[in-house]
């Protein structure tokens, strides 16, 4: 009776077993979920990202490093999402297997159901909580990464715009700098042409000066030769004049003695005439005395003729000396005129040289101004270079910051690699592929890091070279400025000296002109004096000629009267009457003799005056000669001083020319440096143009990749939203599953309590028998598989 109510329970148990067998279907259907879990778009995005990664790994593709890193980060994030998706699928499969195990245990092991169900429920709850927490953490991480990516995108857009503006500014500055350089080079070319022209002109002027110096030297040599000849002639003429003066003095002494003798004879003649008058009686003696007197008269007539001849010779010599003196004066005047003409020519050449020197000085001033302008332009270019260098340093600091950011990203990548290693332990099938990809990426990163290190080393070397070059250029510019200042000081000193010398030369020229005027006046006075003396000499010569003619007439008369005297002597006795006539004649002759004596006295007095005048003229001539010699010496001293001044000026001109040569050599050195700088600038221009072209190409590629990236990001955002919806659905289903598990646990607890009651009611032997004959079947509530539908949406 007690067992009767249990029979329907057995039937109910069979029904429950059948229901339980039917309920195993949904749990098995969980294992047949699709591999994509409803994210086909993510697979397409992964394929596109793999293509992008391959293109990034290729050496042909060139893009900004930040864009590369950004794309790599996106690829890694998408890979992580795909791995998370696969991990969730694996976990769901594991949970389905565990549920199948639980169903199997519930079916096969009714005795140990409590422990296993409790452990299963605990494990399931723990796993569910852990999975929920991990999913939440991953969702927050993905959201944070998405926000970071958006911030990076905005920063990159801003940085790209700033770089575009900077590039435009740099292009404008570069164009301005190129224009300024072209202008400076044109100015330098014009200055070099002008310098070459001035150098050629200076060389021509130098050659002209050398020719003039040669002409001056030749003229000086001729002057010295003519001076020597003039001195020799002068010495010869002075010797001849001294000889003639000596002979003249000897003859003068002889004439003076003869005059004395004539006076004595005249006294004797007077005495004889007195004796003749007194001793008229003694005719024989008188005749003898008359004969003696005639002989003495003849003797004295011969001496007088000789004296006349000597006087004629002396007059001829005086004429010769006067002619030679006039010739010598003419020659000296011609030589003086030649020297004056040469001095005038030299003064004209000096004036022309001064004018040329002034022109050259003005040209030097213009060149100095142009040089200062070029220096100011070079300073401006140097300041522009410094600005460009500062901008480069700013860019380098920005690059260093980016490198630091890259190092941080590398650390993040290493952490991600560690996470990948942990994931590779779970997925052994994809381990080799990901390791190869990671090796390739690490190799590329090492290459890029090595390239970055090499480029940094090159940049440091170039900076050092640039710093050394700038230091050298500054030192050279300072040395040049010091040299230019010294040259300007020296030039100012030379200009002062030249002005002082010019003043001295002008003073010397004025003195020379004064001396020339004085010499001309003295020469005119001397010529006038000579003319007056010549006139006086001509007058005295005419008087002397008249007196000689009178003496000749008287001698002829005496010759005529001699035969008459002989006749008178012969007829003295016969013609005594004629004595009175003769006495009258003698008295007349006495008167004539007195007149002759008076004339002789006057002649002697005039001759003495003439001699005194000649001595005065000689003294004046000596004084004039001394004055001329002094003046010539002064002229020679002035000429020597002028020659010394010319020599000093020539030396100064040579020094200036040497300084000009040095300046030209330094200008050539500067030109070479400028050409080197220009070549370096052209190389920089080419490199900058190449870099600008590369930047333009990279910008185009970057824009294309950026558009693709934006499309992919949009797709990924859409896919992420879908995945989030899927994850939310999964969490809802997991919650429903937990609730169902709780219901199952409550039902199991109720069944366990029922079993306990049954155990308490029945004996253990009955239970063993029942266990042998009866297999209990548990009926679980049928749960429809809605997860498949929700997951496959």
From Swiss-Prot:
<dbReference type="InterPro" id="IPR038834">
    <property type="entry name" value="CCDC175"/>
</dbReference>
<feature type="coiled-coil region">
    <location>
        <begin position="562"/>
        <end position="679"/>
    </location>
</feature>
<feature type="coiled-coil region">
    <location>
        <begin position="716"/>
        <end position="745"/>
    </location>
</feature>
<feature type="coiled-coil region">
    <location>
        <begin position="205"/>
        <end position="377"/>
    </location>
</feature>
<protein>
    <recommendedName>
        <fullName>Coiled-coil domain-containing protein 175</fullName>
    </recommendedName>
</protein>
<keyword id="KW-0175">Coiled coil</keyword>
<feature type="coiled-coil region">
    <location>
        <begin position="131"/>
        <end position="163"/>
    </location>
</feature>
<feature type="coiled-coil region">
    <location>
        <begin position="431"/>
        <end position="535"/>
    </location>
</feature>
